[in-house]
């Protein structure tokens, strides 16, 4: 069954829930174990050239839909465990032993944040990205909105569909990392640009429809409310510290999302209004990364045909390729940025020599 591998994200969320249930150092074990599994798996597994054209779309969509309740349940477990174990909140149906099991130290809480944020940012936002490219009115669009809210980025679908896919590779795209730009500078610039552009897009949409800006018709305001709902719920159940843990998990997921943006287009350029081609994205055939991200790794084909569902994306082996899998690239960009730039330099040189148009080379030389 071609889709069998895409049950792995669901198993990972379930495994993380078991680790949270066990408490103690188990969340750290999950985070480190998953990081090693994906980074080494990307190196050892065969390149991902699988053709999924014949899969059942209803099954594939069901896999995406299922990520939503699983991650909501995982966040709920975080709220309950911190509320009971640290805030000493008494909840019905839970025995006294849970308070001791979930009495996390600050370092153990960090393990919870890293584990849950990794799944939200790696699995959740990837499923959300797939959902928000569905036709308007499709039920998965709502799933995508709520999944993006978990990464403190509910406005992402507005800007991504109307901005990034139109402006990728140009100076008008906040989500394209510039040559030599550090990932931390990029995260700030991209986030600010995304929120500002999403507000502009939504304001113009409401003006065209003669609807009020400060109303329930405003998708931007609804997106902010969805993101705020999770830490507010955590505060109501378990107090301020519980809300902080949930908020930090969501912010870590946001960092991961922006770092994915960073690695997908780092240093690439495109002349404004020129056709978007496979060369304008860094592609990857890493099997583990592709499995966990629902083939977000086939980014070159995605940007050429944004409406295609993940099972119809081709691997495009002739597109520019990342030298690592996604998670390896993320960790290197975050922890060893100078090394990231050094390794990417020959790949960028090759891109300008073999992929870039004359106009793109001239554009890069002037920037």
Feature map (PLM): residue ranges:
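Alpha-helical bilayer-embedded segments of polytopic membrane proteins, i.e.
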Residues: 1-45, 58-87, 93-121, 216-261
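Structural hydrophobic-scaffold residues in regular secondary structure
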Residues: 129, 164, 233-234, 299
